[in-house]
């Protein structure tokens, strides 16, 4: 299992605390608002909105919160005006990072990100310096007990997925961006509900980190993900799960 999916699995377990859940709700609400602003408030004709709503329901977000976020996005309710922005940077050991944020003040977060990254052994990079290290892909996670590997393979590959991996606690499915909805529909027809499904930035290659660099990398990712304006952090590290767990537990 790659460092990318190992981190996602551990992060999902950590999100169970109330403080983490509050941040998850904030991020999902902002994603719903942005999706509705860009593609309209009807999830049937707006795949990004449909995916964001699924993320909210997976976190047990109340329907009224989802509906208000949609209305703010379409302009039917007043609310803050968010801007989507992506920053590029390097972490310990030359790990490439993409930081996707939704903010009301781009200038403010540039300084905040620069401080967080430099404090943890990295630096911000110019636009284009890191982006080429990643592919835009669909990512779906399905509970392990939902189906056997053979059945999952039949369903997702026939629907257009690129790959199916065992990530320990679930099935990790990678799709071309344009096939994400079709694979989700195929899973739904088979009675399978994903834990998550989203467009992501998947590393082309991974950089192995150990020891102090591994610990510093985990702390950097945590610090960025705890920033209120950060939606996602993508990084091409590969760290043994035991080292990730140790670093998470030390914080």
Which residues fall in each region the model found?
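Positively charged, low-complexity, intrinsically disordered RNA-binding extensions
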Residues: 139-251
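N-terminal cationic and glycine-rich segments that engage phosphates or anionic surfaces
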Residues: 1-116, 121-125, 130-139, 208
């Amino acid at each position: 299992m790659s460092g990318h999916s190992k981190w996602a699995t551990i992060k999902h377990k950590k999100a169970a605390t109330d403080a983490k859940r509050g941040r998850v709700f904030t991020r999902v609400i902002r994603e719903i608002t942005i999706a509705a602003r860009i593609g309209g408030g009807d999830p049937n004709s707006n795949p990004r909105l449909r995916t964001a709503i699924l993320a909210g329901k997976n976190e047990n977000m109340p329907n009224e919160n989802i509906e208000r976020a949609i209305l703010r996005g379409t302009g039917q309710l007043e609310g803050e005006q968010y801007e989507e922005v992506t920053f590029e940077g390097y972490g310990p050991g030359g790990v490439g990072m993409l930081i996707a944020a939704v903010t009301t003040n781009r200038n403010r977060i540039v300084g905040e990100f620069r401080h967080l990254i430099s404090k943890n052994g990295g630096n911000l990079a110019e636009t284009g310096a890191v982006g080429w290290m990643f592919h835009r892909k669909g990512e779906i996670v399905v509970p392990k007990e939902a189906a056997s590997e053979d059945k999952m393979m039949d369903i997702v590959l026939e629907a257009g997925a690129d790959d199916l991996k065992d990530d320990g606690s679930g099935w990790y499915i990678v799709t071309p961006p344009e096939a994400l909805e079709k694979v989700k529909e195929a899973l739904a027809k088979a009675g399978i509900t994903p834990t998550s499904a989203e467009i992501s930035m998947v590393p082309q290659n991974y950089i192995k980190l150990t020891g102090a660099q591994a610990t510093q990398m985990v702390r950097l990712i945590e610090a960025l993900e705890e920033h209120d304006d950060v939606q996602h952090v993508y990084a091409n590290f590969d760290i043994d799960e035991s080292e990730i767990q140790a670093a998470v537990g030390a914080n």
